Amino acid sequence: SGINPGANVGRSVYHSGTIGACLTARNGGITGVAVSQAVDEGGYMGQGIEEMLRNQKWDSAAEIAALAVGEMCTNLPKEASVLNINVPNMDVSEMKGWAQTTVGTDLMRQMTEVDIEPKIGHEGAYHLNLKWGERITPSSIDNDVGAVANGYVSISWLSRLISQEPPSGSSVESRLDSIFTD
């Protein structure tokens, strides 16, 4: 899936359609590869818009994608998997290398302002405007955000969404018991 304009790193992994397509494939027993490329211009991280894409180095992302997908097809993993690849927006010759990464929690830009405006004609609905500040460059390349921000291709294998034990203090279960218990 991809090449997606805008890095799918950190928090954006959770709402990425590019990654969602690969997760869906894995649910059907098919290995998926999501490829995304950082967008350097504009005021926010994530999905780029038309005017932000004029200086994209698509050939670089395509070269990395072709190499990874070709190898994946030659040597498929034994079980259906999802590989998330994020490529910096630069020539391959300028990249520092690649890094095996975890999904980060850092942002690539600070959020400076959030405006909430009522949506005219839609009672109870609002339009949310996010304004992003200066670019942040995390020092660690151990996570996907830091790797891409520092000029490395990020390679992350994504796991399934799995359930967990209820968090301490959760009362949802006992509340549900109250309506289903005689």
Predicted regions located by residue number:
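Acidic, metal/ion-coordinating pockets
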Residues: 21-24
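Glycine/threonine-rich flexible loop motifs
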Residues: 7-16
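Secondary-structure boundary elements
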Residues: 26-33, 70-78
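Glycine-rich phosphate/pyrophosphate-binding loops
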Residues: 26-48
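Short acidic, glycine-rich surface-loop motifs adjacent to enzyme active sites
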Residues: 1-6
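Active-site-proximal region of nucleotide-activated glycan assembly enzymes
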Residues: 56-63
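C-terminal accessory domains and tails appended to enzymatic cores
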Residues: 51-55, 73-182
